[in-house]
């Protein structure tokens, strides 16, 4: 983790010094969905599937889970070697893209609307 952060410190020096952790922040990830990854457990606070309407959280592509990990993974499953930029942030996951990573503008708009309504 130290080597990785040292190499990218020029654009994330605050995260390198652990000043920004994401604590108290809820981030929306509008993508292919999200899985219950060990590095995200307990911090997925919302779910909406705008593509198929499923109630159970899932990611049939993997991209959304990857993005969520870059954003807020805590690194526990990798023994701390890799963590996201805001490892204490909570995630509101919205599936707006299909299994192939494509989607409809309508689903993206509905996902954005849903997040905006939930924040109020």
Regions found by a protein language model. Name each.
Residues 1-10, 14-16:
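Autoinhibitory propeptides
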Residues 4, 67, 120:
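Catalytic-core segments of hydrolase enzymes
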Residues 10-11, 59, 115:
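Compositionally biased, intrinsically disordered low-complexity regions enriched in proline and serine
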Residues 11-12, 32-34:
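Short secondary-structure boundary micro-motifs
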Residues 16-27, 34-46, 55-106:
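Subtilisin-like serine protease catalytic core
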Residues 112-120:
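Short acidic, glycine-rich surface-loop motifs adjacent to enzyme active sites
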């Amino acid at each position: 983790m130290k080597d990785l952060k040292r190499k990218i410190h020029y654009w994330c020096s605050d995260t390198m010094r652990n000043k920004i952790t994401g604590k108290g922040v809820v981030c929306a990830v509008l993508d292919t969905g999200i899985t219950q990854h060990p590095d995200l457990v307990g911090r997925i606070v919302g779910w909406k599937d705008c593509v198929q309407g499923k109630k159970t959280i899932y990611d049939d592509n993997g991209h959304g889970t990857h993005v969520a990990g870059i954003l807020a993974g805590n690194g526990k499953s990798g023994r701390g070697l890799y963590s996201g930029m805001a490892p204490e942030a909570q995630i509101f996951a919205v599936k707006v893209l299909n299994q192939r990573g494509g989607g409809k503008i309508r689903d993206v708009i509905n996902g954005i609307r849903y997040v905006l309504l939930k924040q109020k």
